Design a protein with these regions (language model features):
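N-terminal glycine-rich phosphate-binding loop for ADP-containing cofactors
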Residues: 1-250
Length: 250
């Protein structure tokens, strides 16, 4: 057992902090400390407040984050908090443009050209393409929306990303270097046609505009709803947690 004054912190990236707190005798001492992976490299730490979290508990955790060299940002308790809630909108656009005619490689090239540290499809390979696929299986939702049909197809072929040596990209043994795979492009087109899409040319400018504005719009909603303390905090989340280019203003 922990002492009564102990802070109870969870590293969850999505679970409801208030629901976790409701299962304890001390909801005022419960909050989220969402470290970003890989934690020894990524500087962001989301400190997620629940409805009952005491101010001194939040202050203590923000101070701890600063002491260990993190960019600690206070976030409200909503699905995905600040960073992952915005990421969902960005990811949706990155997948929609592929259904419409772009390839995963073209999407990554466009966004890395804009200044992102890593394109979304390279990110999916690093995180693991199978994470969403397995959660869909557990939830019993079948194939899900067309935007994830390509992921499903890759996973059915055991192409789970970097860890399996093949995902949206190919990887040589012992290497993390992503190699463009034309087979992925062909599968993306097949999936889009199956979903009823007719391919068109999608420019790099359109890819960047749609993906980045999805981030901007969701960030504005989060600020308006009070889940972020300031626009600067949202900038810090994306610069230090997701590799948004500082020269673009955060």
């Amino acid at each position: 057992a922990v002492k009564p004054s102990a802070i109870l912190a969870t590293n969850t990236s999505y679970l409801d902090i208030d629901e976790i707190a409701s299962a304890t005798q001390r909801p005022t001492q419960v909050l989220g400390l969402h470290f970003f992976s890989p934690a020894h490299i990524m500087k962001l730490l989301e400190v997620v407040r629940g409805k009952a979290t005491a101010q001194d508990v939040m202050d203590a955790c923000l101070a701890v984050g600063k002491k260990i060299g993190k960019e600690a940002v206070l976030a409200g308790n909503c699905h995905g908090f600040i960073g992952n809630r915005m990421l969902e909108k960005y990811s949706r656009q990155s997948r929609e443009v592929v259904l419409e005619g772009a390839t995963p490689w073209e999407v990554d090239q466009a966004l890395q050209g804009f200044g992102m540290a890593m394109g979304p499809y390279r990110m999916y390979d690093v995180v693991g393409v199978d994470l969403g696929w397995r959660s869909r299986q557990l939830a019993g939702v079948g194939r899900g929306e067309p935007i994830v049909w390509l992921d499903n197809k890759l996973c059915e072929m055991e192409r789970f990303g970097q860890k399996s040596g093949h995902g949206f990209y190919k990887y040589e043994a012992g290497s993390r270097q992503a190699i463009h795979d034309p087979e992925t492009d062909m599968m993306a087109r097949e999936v889009a046609e199956e979903a009823g899409y007719t391919a068109r040319d999608v420019s790099s400018d359109e890819i960047v505009t749609r993906c980045i504005l999805a981030l901007v719009n969701e960030g504005a909603r989060i600020l308006d709803e009070g889940y972020a303390e300031s626009a600067e905090d949202i900038d810090r989340v994306y610069r230090f947690g997701y590799g948004f280019p500082a020269e673009r203003g955060g």
